[in-house]
Regions:
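Conserved donor-nucleotide/metal-binding helix-loop-beta segment in metal-dependent transferases, i.e.
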Residues: 92-118
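Glycine-rich N-terminal loop/short-helix segment of MobA-like nucleotidyltransferase
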Residues: 1-12
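Short, glycine-/small-residue-rich phosphate/pyrophosphate-handling segment
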Residues: 126-148
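Conserved alpha/beta core of the MobA/IspD/sugar-nucleotide pyrophosphorylase nucleotidyltransferase superfamily
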Residues: 139, 146-189
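Short aromatic-hydrophobic micro-motifs that form the base-stacking/packing surface
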Residues: 83-85
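Acidic donor-binding segment of Leloir-type glycosyltransferases
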Residues: 29-54
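Short phosphate-binding loop-to-helix
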Residues: 48-81
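A short, N-terminal amphipathic alpha-helix
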Residues: 14-30
Length: 189
Protein backbone atom coordinates (compact mmCIF):
# COMPACT_ATOMS: atom_id res chain seq x y z
CA UNK A 1 0.00 0.00 0.00
CA UNK A 2 2.95 2.29 0.56
CA UNK A 3 3.42 2.30 -3.23
CA UNK A 4 -0.05 3.85 -3.66
CA UNK A 5 -0.34 6.35 -0.83
CA UNK A 6 1.69 8.91 1.07
CA UNK A 7 2.03 8.38 4.83
CA UNK A 8 -0.65 10.94 5.70
CA UNK A 9 -3.03 9.40 3.15
CA UNK A 10 -2.47 5.96 4.69
CA UNK A 11 -3.30 7.37 8.12
CA UNK A 12 -6.46 9.01 6.77
CA UNK A 13 -7.57 5.83 4.96
CA UNK A 14 -6.91 3.66 8.02
CA UNK A 15 -8.87 6.05 10.24
CA UNK A 16 -11.80 6.07 7.78
CA UNK A 17 -11.84 2.25 7.55
CA UNK A 18 -11.55 1.88 11.33
CA UNK A 19 -14.45 4.24 12.00
CA UNK A 20 -16.59 2.62 9.29
CA UNK A 21 -15.95 -0.87 10.73
CA UNK A 22 -16.48 0.30 14.30
CA UNK A 23 -19.90 1.78 13.46
CA UNK A 24 -20.98 -1.46 11.74
CA UNK A 25 -19.97 -3.45 14.82
CA UNK A 26 -21.71 -1.09 17.25
CA UNK A 27 -24.90 -1.21 15.17
CA UNK A 28 -25.06 -5.01 15.40
CA UNK A 29 -27.75 -6.44 17.65
CA UNK A 30 -25.69 -9.64 17.96
CA UNK A 31 -22.71 -8.05 19.72
CA UNK A 32 -22.71 -6.87 23.33
CA UNK A 33 -19.41 -5.00 23.28
CA UNK A 34 -16.80 -3.72 20.85
CA UNK A 35 -13.21 -3.82 22.09
CA UNK A 36 -10.56 -1.79 20.29
CA UNK A 37 -6.92 -2.55 21.02
CA UNK A 38 -4.53 0.03 19.60
CA UNK A 39 -1.49 2.18 20.26
CA UNK A 40 -3.27 5.09 18.55
CA UNK A 41 -4.75 7.44 21.15
CA UNK A 42 -7.21 8.90 18.63
CA UNK A 43 -8.59 5.43 17.84
CA UNK A 44 -8.92 4.66 21.55
CA UNK A 45 -10.65 7.99 22.21
CA UNK A 46 -13.01 7.36 19.30
CA UNK A 47 -13.87 3.93 20.72
CA UNK A 48 -14.58 5.35 24.18
CA UNK A 49 -16.67 8.24 22.85
CA UNK A 50 -18.75 5.90 20.71
CA UNK A 51 -19.60 3.25 23.29
CA UNK A 52 -16.68 0.90 22.80
CA UNK A 53 -14.04 -0.43 25.16
CA UNK A 54 -10.53 0.94 24.59
CA UNK A 55 -7.48 -1.16 25.44
CA UNK A 56 -4.04 0.44 25.17
CA UNK A 57 -1.87 -1.89 23.11
CA UNK A 58 1.44 -2.85 24.69
CA UNK A 59 4.40 -0.88 23.35
CA UNK A 60 6.13 -2.24 20.25
CA UNK A 61 3.54 -4.94 19.86
CA UNK A 62 2.84 -7.03 16.77
CA UNK A 63 -0.64 -7.75 15.41
CA UNK A 64 -0.56 -11.22 16.96
CA UNK A 65 0.55 -9.83 20.32
CA UNK A 66 -2.21 -7.20 20.20
CA UNK A 67 -4.87 -9.83 19.44
CA UNK A 68 -3.48 -12.06 22.21
CA UNK A 69 -3.62 -9.09 24.59
CA UNK A 70 -7.25 -8.48 23.64
CA UNK A 71 -8.14 -12.16 24.11
CA UNK A 72 -6.47 -12.16 27.53
CA UNK A 73 -8.45 -9.06 28.50
CA UNK A 74 -11.69 -10.67 27.31
CA UNK A 75 -11.01 -13.81 29.36
CA UNK A 76 -10.85 -11.68 32.52
CA UNK A 77 -14.30 -10.21 31.83
CA UNK A 78 -16.12 -13.52 31.58
CA UNK A 79 -16.97 -16.22 29.05
CA UNK A 80 -18.55 -15.54 25.72
CA UNK A 81 -18.15 -15.48 21.98
CA UNK A 82 -15.43 -13.41 20.38
CA UNK A 83 -15.23 -11.95 16.88
CA UNK A 84 -11.78 -10.90 15.68
CA UNK A 85 -12.05 -8.51 12.78
CA UNK A 86 -9.54 -6.16 11.13
CA UNK A 87 -10.58 -2.71 10.01
CA UNK A 88 -9.60 -3.09 6.35
CA UNK A 89 -12.85 -4.70 5.16
CA UNK A 90 -14.53 -1.83 3.29
CA UNK A 91 -17.07 -4.00 1.47
CA UNK A 92 -18.45 -5.75 4.58
CA UNK A 93 -22.10 -4.87 5.15
CA UNK A 94 -24.22 -5.06 8.29
CA UNK A 95 -25.96 -8.06 6.70
CA UNK A 96 -22.61 -9.82 6.16
CA UNK A 97 -21.72 -9.20 9.79
CA UNK A 98 -25.04 -10.58 11.08
CA UNK A 99 -24.74 -13.64 8.82
CA UNK A 100 -21.24 -14.31 10.15
CA UNK A 101 -22.41 -14.03 13.74
CA UNK A 102 -25.00 -16.78 13.16
CA UNK A 103 -22.46 -19.33 11.87
CA UNK A 104 -21.12 -20.64 15.17
CA UNK A 105 -22.94 -23.75 16.40
CA UNK A 106 -20.86 -25.87 18.75
CA UNK A 107 -19.65 -25.25 22.28
CA UNK A 108 -16.10 -25.19 20.88
CA UNK A 109 -16.35 -23.73 17.40
CA UNK A 110 -14.13 -21.57 15.23
CA UNK A 111 -15.53 -19.84 12.14
CA UNK A 112 -12.83 -18.56 9.81
CA UNK A 113 -13.33 -16.23 6.85
CA UNK A 114 -10.23 -16.22 4.61
CA UNK A 115 -9.17 -13.46 2.27
CA UNK A 116 -9.97 -13.78 -1.45
CA UNK A 117 -6.68 -15.60 -2.09
CA UNK A 118 -7.43 -17.98 0.80
CA UNK A 119 -4.03 -17.28 2.29
CA UNK A 120 -4.84 -14.76 5.01
CA UNK A 121 -7.53 -14.62 7.68
CA UNK A 122 -10.06 -11.77 7.49
CA UNK A 123 -12.35 -12.77 10.36
CA UNK A 124 -12.47 -15.34 13.14
CA UNK A 125 -15.49 -16.05 15.31
CA UNK A 126 -14.71 -18.06 18.44
CA UNK A 127 -17.09 -19.65 20.91
CA UNK A 128 -14.47 -18.95 23.63
CA UNK A 129 -11.64 -16.42 23.90
CA UNK A 130 -9.21 -19.12 25.09
CA UNK A 131 -9.42 -21.12 21.85
CA UNK A 132 -6.96 -19.17 19.74
CA UNK A 133 -3.27 -18.44 19.64
CA UNK A 134 -3.27 -15.68 16.99
CA UNK A 135 -1.17 -16.47 13.93
CA UNK A 136 -1.97 -13.60 11.59
CA UNK A 137 0.49 -12.87 8.81
CA UNK A 138 1.75 -15.11 6.01
CA UNK A 139 -0.47 -18.13 5.43
CA UNK A 140 -2.55 -17.38 8.52
CA UNK A 141 -5.64 -19.05 7.05
CA UNK A 142 -3.89 -22.43 6.91
CA UNK A 143 -2.33 -21.91 10.35
CA UNK A 144 -5.68 -21.08 11.93
CA UNK A 145 -7.31 -24.11 10.26
CA UNK A 146 -4.58 -26.40 11.64
CA UNK A 147 -5.01 -24.85 15.07
CA UNK A 148 -8.79 -25.40 15.04
CA UNK A 149 -8.56 -29.02 13.91
CA UNK A 150 -5.75 -29.93 16.31
CA UNK A 151 -7.68 -28.44 19.23
CA UNK A 152 -10.78 -30.48 18.46
CA UNK A 153 -12.90 -27.41 17.76
CA UNK A 154 -15.67 -27.53 15.20
CA UNK A 155 -14.19 -25.73 12.19
CA UNK A 156 -16.40 -23.74 9.86
CA UNK A 157 -14.79 -22.02 6.88
CA UNK A 158 -17.24 -19.43 5.62
CA UNK A 159 -16.75 -17.78 2.25
CA UNK A 160 -18.30 -14.33 2.02
CA UNK A 161 -17.05 -12.20 -0.86
CA UNK A 162 -17.53 -8.90 1.00
CA UNK A 163 -15.63 -9.97 4.10
CA UNK A 164 -12.99 -11.73 2.00
CA UNK A 165 -12.10 -8.54 0.12
CA UNK A 166 -9.59 -6.54 2.13
CA UNK A 167 -7.09 -3.79 1.34
CA UNK A 168 -3.72 -5.53 1.59
CA UNK A 169 -2.16 -4.90 -1.81
CA UNK A 170 -1.86 -2.05 -4.32
CA UNK A 171 -4.26 -4.01 -6.56
CA UNK A 172 -6.83 -4.18 -3.74
CA UNK A 173 -6.54 -0.43 -3.25
CA UNK A 174 -6.76 0.29 -6.98
CA UNK A 175 -10.02 -1.67 -7.19
CA UNK A 176 -11.36 0.03 -4.05
CA UNK A 177 -10.38 3.44 -5.40
CA UNK A 178 -12.27 2.81 -8.66
CA UNK A 179 -15.39 1.32 -7.08
CA UNK A 180 -15.79 3.20 -3.81
CA UNK A 181 -13.76 6.39 -3.83
CA UNK A 182 -14.41 7.43 -7.43
CA UNK A 183 -17.80 6.00 -8.41
CA UNK A 184 -18.93 6.30 -11.98
CA UNK A 185 -22.32 7.88 -12.50
CA UNK A 186 -24.33 6.24 -15.23
CA UNK A 187 -27.13 8.29 -16.69
CA UNK A 188 -30.02 6.96 -18.71
CA UNK A 189 -30.59 8.80 -22.00
Amino acid sequence: MRECLEADEMIELNRFLFEQTFHKLRASNSLDKVLVVSQDDQALDFARLNGGIALQENAESSLNAAVAQALQFIMTTGPGRVLILPADLPYMTAEDLEALLTRETAERAMVIVPDTRQLGTNAILLSNANMLKPQFGRRSFQKHIRQATSSGAELIVWLNENIQQDLDTPQDFSFYNKIILQPTHIMKE
